[in-house]
Amino acid sequence: MRNSIFWWIFLGFMLSLDFYVFQALRVLTNSAGARAKLIIHVIYWTISALAITMLIILPYLHFTQQNRVVRNTFFAIIVGLFFSKVIASIFFLVDDLRRVIQWAAGKLFFSNTEGETMEQGVKISRSVFLSWAGMIVGGGLFSSLVYGLSNKYRYRTHRVQLAFDNLPAGLKGLKIVQVSDIHSGSFTDKAAVMRGVDKILKEKADLILFTGDLVNDVAHEMDGYMDVFDKLKAPMGVYSIFGNHDYGDYHSWPDRNDEHKRKEELAGKHLLTPMQQANLDKLKDVHAKLGWRLLLDEYVELEKNGDKMALLGVQNWSSKARFPKYGDLKKAYEGSQDYPFKILMSHDPSHWDAQVKPTYPDIDLMLAGHTHGMQFGVEIPGFRWSPVQYVYKEWAGLYEDGKQKLYVNRGYGFIGYPGRVGILPEITVIELT
């Protein structure tokens, strides 16, 4: 990361933000005494310097259990300060644009004296107001992100009843628990994670389905949590799929070199490196040791009360260009045509619009995750919003189109920002009727 051009660009942008926000701080402290002004400025630059230092150190903190807390703390502070300053800067930018337009108008349409008089009459009140507004909104965002750190293990159970006209009588009342996006590499509190597993077990579900992203990057992230998640059991079994993070695409593999990139160019597609493939094989073993049946572009037959259904599971497949397409729904679907009811597990919800609806109208229910609801948003009765909705049309909860349904789980774990604001971690309980 530290060698990537993105990291240097981000570091430069952080420094630019620090100086830009400081200009607004100078406006607000202009009337303060010299001592008070000095103290405020020193505090500001101390915090900014610490954030920059954390950003520089972060890439050197290799993944270990001991480093998880430090990495999460550093990342939370960096992200919190960054977005708070970005939001605050929008207000400051409005003020700067206003002053530029006002100055230009004064030069073009008024005499110098008239322009200066107009500027003097409004610049202090408007500049101070917008500076205060920016600081308050930015501070409010930072406060909400700090509060959100306490929500990362506040598991919320969402209960949905789904009615299907073609559901066989023997499957009516089937109880499914869906879990998604565990991201075990982010956890720092094993007891809290276990409390979530206990909530799942208390549901006494017939079937438990996990829709991908067991780890952030590498299989050994699960080393300390095998004895937590191997407790997930259900009469009809526990089934799982891979998500985009499970392939290790975001990890710096030593053998992702020029030679490997040439192989990708010749193949015309993304290829796993040998080390990456070995890691994926280890992760397959993790699923097996947990007692989970990992579905890799295939289906299994499930039966209850004499009636049968098909459960399909595909590897990660996204309509978004930044995510490689590993899954093969055609392969998974082959042979399941005659089953009266079908459930598909596919990690990325964009799969629903891109392939499932137009090509497989007899897939009754798709279960997905991936979005996390961006771990930030607002959910109140009658209103739901998150920035992720501008990227994903289906990003949380239930969606219906004709006889087909999609449910997007908000995620059990977290990645990046180690918290949740408004969008809490989810355990989904589905009853088929």
Model-derived regions: residue spans:
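Non-catalytic terminal accessory segments
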Residues: 1-153
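Active-site neighborhood of phospho(di)ester-bond hydrolases with catalytic His/Asp-centered motifs
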Residues: 177-180, 208-212, 237-244, 295-297, ...
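Membrane-embedded segments
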Residues: 153-158, 170-259
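Conserved beta-sheet core of the metallophosphoesterase superfamily
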Residues: 349-428
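Beta-strand-turn-beta hairpins that frame and shape the catalytic cleft
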Residues: 163-177, 292-293, 299-311, 337, ...
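Acidic/histidine-rich helix-loop elements
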Residues: 176-191, 215-217, 248-272, 318-324, ...
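Acidic, His/Gly-rich catalytic cores of divalent-metal-dependent hydrolytic chemistry
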Residues: 18-21, 31, 55-57, 61-68, ...
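Extended active-site neighborhood of metal-dependent phosphoesterases/phosphodiesterases
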Residues: 160-163, 226-314
